[in-house]
């Protein structure tokens, strides 16, 4: 019915908008208490790193998942990795290409409860101009207006043209990367 009314109004030169969907409450991230980290593998060794600068726009309530949304923007130039040489290599064009692609963005407008507890955000991650679907699994505890969320996403870096496929000079970097996050936020307003 709403679609028919909008179509009729449009043909008559009038503008109309559909009723806005209800939004879950907004949360403001506490950057000092939040972390965004990753773990990859080089040969058989775990390589750990993270991003020092990221923001999150979050709307969430356990009883209003239909109105929930997440948007995370990551300053890719803020990447830190074990060993200073690795960080410089990772910023380069063959890997993250931070000069041309300084920001990565994750957006999700679909969040669902998972059997056994926790949540899954069905979102899209954009890195180096490539957009790929990425599910984000997380748990959240809300107490006295403060939310603490811990979760992960499992990525295949080569899906985003990040780094080579296979070994280079005898060094093999696994395509799988675990992204881990800890976000603390206070209820806005």
Summary of predicted features, one role per range:
Residues 2-15:
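Bacterial N-terminal signal peptides
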Residues 19-189:
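Low-complexity, acidic/polar, glycine-enriched regions of mature
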């Amino acid at each position: 019915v709403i679609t028919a009314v909008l179509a009729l109004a449009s043909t008559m030169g009038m503008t109309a908008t559909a009723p806005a969907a209800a939004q879950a409450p907004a949360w403001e991230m506490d950057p000092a208490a939040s972390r965004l980290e990753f773990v990859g593998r080089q040969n058989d060794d775990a390589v750990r790193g993270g991003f020092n600068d990221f923001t999150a726009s979050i709307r969430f309530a356990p009883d209003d998942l239909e109105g929930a949304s997440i948007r995370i923007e990551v300053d890719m130039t803020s990447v830190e990795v074990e060993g200073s040489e690795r960080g410089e290599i990772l910023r380069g064009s063959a890997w993250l290409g931070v000069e041309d692609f300084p920001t990565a963005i994750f957006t999700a407008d679909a969040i669902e409860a998972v059997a056994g507890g926790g949540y899954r955000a069905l979102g899209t991650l954009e890195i180096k101009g490539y957009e790929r679907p990425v599910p984000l699994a997380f748990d959240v505890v809300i107490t006295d207006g403060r939310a603490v969320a811990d979760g992960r996403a499992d990525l295949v870096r080569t899906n985003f043209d990040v780094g080579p496929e296979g070994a280079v000079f005898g060094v093999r970097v696994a395509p799988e990367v675990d992204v881990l996050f800890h976000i603390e936020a206070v209820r806005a307003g």
